[in-house]
Regions:
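Anion-binding alpha/beta catalytic cores of soluble intermediary-metabolism enzymes, centered on
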Residues: 1-277, 281-305
């Protein structure tokens, strides 16, 4: 299975409009050109048309929007003002935006925010940023304007991991999903349950796999005990129960050590009767320490991408 090829085919079939927020970055401009040329999606590229032209790529079919001259800027400023109305700036103790004009001034300085506003207004289906902006600056507009899906309180991330040879001893289609490896440092049981449900949805909709979700720990079904005063295993057990209640249709179980989650012979030994043990393809790490280390080990030592 060629995951990227399959993903491109899905994108072509969907025919969505995507905002690329960083028209000042040569890589983003080239990507916009390729995406439109191959019919992967419709593209709105934010930036100055003259500056974008200097990169020398064919921009035929790419809609270039300069926020500073965009006729829709007032509409998007209104969207931002309403989304943040009543929010107080913690540093000044004053409202974030005194009026729509202040919201507009802020949006025109932050093209990632502008892209989020285009999406929020219904003029696009998604926005992409982060090529030349920090994680914090990339996430902030989404957190402030787009917010979370109904029923989900926790914003989280996940990594779709693809085997180097396209398949793996334990995962014949070569695809797994790891969450959350980048955002939530020490999630609570409730947050971990949200992460599990959201990651499973990504596994199904984007990775194209039927998720079998393993809630990871150093313990498998009570094999390990917490040190006094800690609740590391207990948190995962609670999160597992909460996730099952939130999404009873999911194949989800835990707590599992990684080998019990992925290796059939270990899963059968340590968690007999579990539909997930030994067959998991979607892995929920208990905190960002474990998740970040885990995906980088898979990438650097295992060659997963």
């Amino acid at each position: 299975m060629d995951f990227v090829k399959d993903l491109r085919a899905k994108a072509k079939a969907a025919g969505k409009t995507i905002v690329l927020c960083e028209g000042e970055d040569k890589r983003v401009v080239e990507a916009a050109s390729v995406i439109v040329k191959e019919g992967i999606a419709k593209i709105i590229l934010l930036g100055n048309a003259d500056e974008i032209a200097k990169f020398g790529f064919d921009m035929s079919g790419v809609k270039i929007v300069d926020p500073k001259t965009d006729s829709n800027a007032d509409k998007y400023a209104e969207v931002l003002y309403k989304a943040r109305e009543g929010k107080i700036n913690k540093k000044t103790g004053l409202p974030e935006y005194a009026d729509v004009a202040a919201a507009k001034a802020a949006a025109l300085k932050d093209y990632t925010m502008y892209g989020a506003l285009i999406l929020k207004a219904g003029d696009a289906d998604g926005f992409v940023s982060g090529a030349c902006h920090s994680t914090a600056n990339t996430l902030r507009p989404g957190l402030q304007v787009i917010k979370t899906a109904p029923g989900i309180k926790t914003v989280s991330s996940c990594f779709i991991m693809v085997a180097p040879e396209g398949s793996n001893k334990y995962l014949p289609n070569g695809i797994s999903v790891f969450g959350d490896c980048a955002i939530n440092i020490e999630p609570s049981a409730e947050e971990l349950a949200d992460i599990a449900v959201a990651t499973a949805e990504t596994a199904k909709k984007i990775a194209g796999i039927e998720p079998k979700v393993a809630m990871l720990s150093f313990s498998t079904k009570g094999s390990g005990n917490d040190a006094k005063g800690l609740n590391t295993v207990g948190k995962v057990v609670e999160a597992t129960n909460l996730a099952k209640a939130k999404a009873p249709e999911l194949a989800l179980d835990g707590e599992f050590q990684f080998d019990a989650a992925i290796a059939p012979e270990v899963g059968e030994l340590k968690a007999p009767g579990s539909a997930v043990a030994g067959h998991a393809n979607t892995f929920i790490f208990p905190n960002i320490n474990a998740g970040n280390i885990g995906y980088k080990i898979a990438a650097r030592m295992g060659g997963w991408k």
